Amino acid sequence: MNARTPNSLTMGGDKSFADASPVPIANVRSLIEATFQRLRADIVEGRLAAGSRLAIEDLKSRYEVSGGTVREALSLLVANNLVQTQAQRGFHVTPMSLDDMRDLAATRIALECEALRQSVLNGDAEWEARVVSSYHRLSLLDERTMRDPVHLFNQWEQANRDFHEALISACSSAWTQRFLSILYLQMERYRRLTAMHNRPARNVHEEHLALRDSALARDAERCTELLRMHIESSISVVRQFGLLR
């Protein structure tokens, strides 16, 4: 009987061990990240409705990935509080409510107003330049987005985030800025909800202009009060139009 050599394993009907080599970890991680980003966008932009069930099989077909990849992406979204999971009930998109929006807004006000106060009092010339440049980019989008929120919201959202981050960038607390980044992302679904109704209810462009001017004037008291009103205005729009309970 002839002994089979290692090379003979690759011939005939036998499959090479090399053919069954595992997928590189980097590729697996990038696929999970891509699925996470697509899922997140579908949730935040409302294609997967708040409170709706997220069936693994449906998501596998939707994103053309394995069940394991879907579960990993969903776990990341659970950590981001955009998805909830319960025993025997599977995964669901985290519901939206007026109480949740109020809670997020109140927490954001408490942290962001203090971070803004520190920045206004301590910011240097580089901070001023960042505030001015980020405001300029945002102002170019403010009025256009109010006229066409559906198509321009993603651009406006990034510019709006850049402006708010610029305002508090001279705050010395890295933890405060980190928590505010989380809160800002959590409120994105609510900002999208109110964007469709802002035009008759408020002038967001004027609110941003007033924030910029008071920040550059180093008027910490006025600037923080304007920020509080700016954040609370979104709640007023939701209540005015009965968008949430």
UniProtKB/Swiss-Prot annotation:
Entry's SMART domains? FCD, HTH_GNTR
The protein's matches in Gene3D superfamilies, at most eight in alphabetical order, are given as:
GntR ligand-binding domain-like, Winged helix-like DNA-binding domain superfamily/Winged helix DNA-binding domain
Residue ranges annotated for the HTH gntR-type domain, each copy included: 29-96
> Which organism does this record belong to?
Paraburkholderia xenovorans (strain LB400)
Membrane-crossing residue ranges in chain numbering: none
Name used for this protein in its record: Uncharacterized HTH-type transcriptional regulator BphR
Record's InterPro entries?
GntR_C (IPR011711), TF_FadR/GntR_C (IPR008920), Tscrpt_reg_HTH_GntR (IPR000524), WH-like_DNA-bd_sf (IPR036388), WH_DNA-bd_sf (IPR036390)
List keywords of the entry alphabetically.
Answer: DNA-binding, Transcription, Transcription regulation
A GO molecular function annotation here is:
DNA-binding transcription factor activity
- Pfam family, any one: GntR
Matches recorded under SUPFAM superfamilies? GntR ligand-binding domain-like, Winged helix' DNA-binding domain
Q: Which residues bind DNA?
A: 56-75
